From Swiss-Prot:
The keyword Phosphoprotein does not apply. It is an enzyme of class 2 (transferase). Its EC number is 2.6.1.33. InterPro entries: DegT/StrS_aminotransferase, PyrdxlP-dep_Trfase, PyrdxlP-dep_Trfase_major. GO terms for molecular function: dTDP-4-amino-4,6-dideoxy-D-glucose transaminase activity; pyridoxal phosphate binding. The modification N6-(pyridoxal phosphate)lysine is found at residue 186. It comes from the Bacteria. SUPFAM superfamilies: PLP-dependent transferases. This is dTDP-4-amino-4,6-dideoxy-D-glucose transaminase. GO terms for biological process: lipopolysaccharide biosynthetic process. The lineage of its organism: Bacteria, Pseudomonadati, Pseudomonadota, Gammaproteobacteria, Enterobacterales. PANTHER family: PROTEIN RV3402C, TRANSAMINASE. CDD domains: AHBA_syn. Belongs to the DegT/DnrJ/EryC1 family.
Length: 371
């Protein structure tokens, strides 16, 4: 069908000429890292864009998540979702903590807040939900539970940059962003970065020290920190990309709508509508393929691949079924029936800013057996 491979996602890059003046300034300043002027400017611009006061930039979102757990001095058990990229649970494990998995919603992909309370034990100290596929969790309900039990809440918002929820950008308590970054699902990383939104200046100060080896000043180290600093080049790229984020979202929205219209009403294919109070960033287009469709999920994946179209079984396998986690009591299939069922059915179709609408039509025709 295609001579050229269609990736499941692709970076949306500015014109190189737009980026060059930033590089020239970096070369002139000879300031490559350690809280340079572009780093400082990006923190300020992101605060304005998201409507928050305290942001800390990181070299990537995984290091940010590890640092957030460390900054809040989390101990014992952390309630989280099995339906996410593995970095979510790895960050918990790297802190010497135990992830406790809770099943996802029956009509979505996020953690089911109604099942959180039964997973709380005397060892529980935090809840780590994920805004999956850019759809916000039930943040108000989760916060009520956290307040009742004295728990911290850290949101992994890697999917949710630029998402509006009930009239405001998605954030609450502490948020980990993988922002302004497009990746070919880890196979070809172009620019990378992460950020933490903190609830107050004191928490931001601790985070900023932790990401810089725990250094407080030239003579004082206050904590066993790491190197999580964002470089000036990545910060500069973030500043350029921030100018285009709304336009990119608008273009992906068109692709999302086209997929929905072409696949609407197809027996055996489920497309969740998303939260009615949310304006998505349209970075993912997941469908669920069940026995009512004329081929299985895996057959659809192979058919697309045979025609040089890369889809992804995202998230399969579940985190809870991976070797380092499947021994946990909470990882049992009986405890996570919905997440396991969704993981066996999900297929993310190509969606990115520069995806041609004609390709979307061809992808859907191929799936529906019309070619």
């Amino acid at each position: 069908m295609n001579d050229k491979t269609i990736p499941v996602t692709q970076p949306s890059l500015p014109e190189l000429a737009e980026f060059m003046p930033y590089l020239e300034k970096i070369w002139k300043n000879k300031w490559l890292t350690n809280n340079g002027p572009f780093h400082q400017e990006l923190e300020e611009k992101l605060c304005e864009f998201l409507g928050v006061q305290h942001i800390s930039l990181f070299n990537n979102a995984t290091i940010a998540l590890i640092t957030a757990l460390q900054a809040l001095r989390i101990t014992g058990e952390v309630i989280t979702t099995p339906y996410s990229f593995v970095a979510t649970s790895h960050a918990i494990l790297w802190n010497g903590l135990t992830p406790v998995f809770v099943d996802i919603e029956n009509d979505g992909y996020n953690i089911d807040y109604r099942k959180i309370e039964q997973a709380i034990t005397p060892k529980t100290s935090a809840i780590l939900p994920v805004h999956c596929y850019s759809t916000p969790c039930e943040v108000e309900e989760i916060q009520k539970i956290a307040d009742n039990y004295g728990l911290k809440v850290i949101y992994d918002a890697a999917h949710a940059f630029g998402v509006n929820f009930k009239g405001g950008k998605v954030y609450l308590t502490m948020v980990i962003y993988q922002f302004l970054v497009s990746m070919r699902r880890k196979s070809s990383i172009n620019f990378e970065g992460g950020a933490i939104i903190s609830p107050d200046a004191k928490t931001k100060l601790r985070i900023d020290r932790l990401k810089n080896f725990g250094i407080a000043d030239e003579l004082t180290v206050t904590a066993p920190g790491i190197n999580g600093k964002m470089s000036e080049i990545n910060a500069a790229f973030g500043l350029v990309q921030l100018k285009h984020i709304e336009g990119s979202i608008s273009k992906r929205k068109i692709i999302d709508s086209l997929y929905r219209n072409l696949l609407k009403g197809t027996p055996g294919i489920t497309i969740f509508p998303g939260n009615i109070n949310t304006n998505s960033n349209y970075s993912y287009f997941p469908i669920l393929i069940d026995d009512g469709f004329h081929m299985s999920r895996d057959q659809a994946y192979e058919l697309l691949k045979k025609n040089n179209i890369l889809s992804r079984k995202y998230f399969y396998p579940l985190i809870s079924n991976m070797p380092m986690y499947r021994g946990l009591i909470s990882a049992s299939v009986d405890n996570l029936p919905i997440a396991n069922s969704v993981a066996d059915k999900v297929l993310c179709l190509p969606i990115y800013t520069d995806l041609n609408e004609e390709i979307v039509v061809k992808i859907t025709k191929l799936l529906l057996g019309k070619m």
